[in-house]
């Protein structure tokens, strides 16, 4: 099985995770994430109005938040503690086609302060409704012996595009993405997910994150929601 957390399969993300796990930047100390998207802003096409409704389960926290926190875990380590705040900055959303309004029942801004099992602490500013030309993703990791940064500017968020890796330590260039043959940047990470699954099938292995990982991500998102709602730190135990 495979699930839709494709960002962790990006070759550049995998190289960043390798730099951390191999100790090239020393002991991971802290990280800072800024994750922005054009989506879930003050105006939306009517076909996406379901993303404003809590019952749909598809919203800024579950989509952009879920992908962002999964990348934190892919590069650093599983998250063990979470403090959070959420805000709905646009409680009334304009529907593009009709000019009418729809009530937004879900957050469009998420702030997370967390800690991973490796001991590294991190902050994540997860922001919706950013102008497309200003959208950015930045994931800065500081270690005891060095640093690395992952960046992207895809308007629909980090899960939808390629990334750039920089570091003060030398590293081999990331592998070429399997979906780099002109079929569009949004396919890069999904293509890598399928390639990983195919390798598993050929080898009789089960290394591609599946339903158990999806459950973990859902619990992570729920921990963010609970931390924001209760004002209490949440401890994650799988």
Model-derived segments and spans:
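Hydrophobic residues in well-ordered beta-strands that form the structural core
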Residues: 1-3, 124, 150
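Predominantly a Rossmann-like dinucleotide-binding segment in NAD(P)-dependent oxidoreductases
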Residues: 2, 7-103, 231
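Glycine-rich phosphate/pyrophosphate-binding beta-alpha loops
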Residues: 66, 125-134
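C-terminal glycine/acidic-rich active-site capping loop/insertion
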Residues: 81, 91-103, 111-116, 139-212, ...
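Glycine/proline-rich active-site loop of Rossmann-fold NAD(P)-dependent oxidoreductases
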Residues: 105-106, 120, 133-136
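Short arginine-rich
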Residues: 220-230
């Amino acid at each position: 099985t495979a699930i839709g957390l494709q960002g962790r399969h990006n070759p550049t993300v995998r190289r960043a995770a390798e730099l951390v796990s191999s100790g090239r930047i020393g002991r991971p100390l802290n990280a800072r994430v800024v994750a922005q998207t054009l989506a879930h802003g003050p105006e939306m096409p009517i076909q996406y109005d379901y993303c404003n409704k809590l019952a749909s389960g598809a919203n800024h926290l579950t989509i952009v938040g879920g992908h962002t926190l999964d990348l934190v875990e892919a590069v650093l380590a599983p998250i063990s503690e979470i403090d959070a705040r959420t805000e709905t900055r646009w409680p009334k959303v304009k529907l593009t086609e009709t000019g009418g309004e729809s009530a937004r029942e879900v957050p469009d801004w998420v702030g997370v302060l967390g800690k991973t099992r490796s001991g590294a602490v991190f902050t994540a500013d997860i922001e919706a409704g950013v102008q497309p030309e200003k959208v950015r993703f930045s994931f800065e990791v500081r270690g005891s012996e060095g640093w690395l940064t992952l960046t992207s500017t895809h308007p629909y968020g980090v899960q939808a595009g390629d990334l750039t890796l920089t570091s003060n330590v030398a590293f081999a260039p990331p592998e070429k993405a399997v979906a780099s043959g002109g079929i569009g940047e949004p396919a890069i990470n999904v293509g890598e997910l399928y390639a990983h699954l195919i390798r598993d099938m050929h080898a009789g292995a089960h290394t591609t994150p599946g339903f158990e990982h999806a459950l973990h991500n859902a619990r992570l998102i729920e921990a963010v929601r609970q931390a924001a709602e209760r004002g209490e730190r949440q401890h994650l135990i799988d």
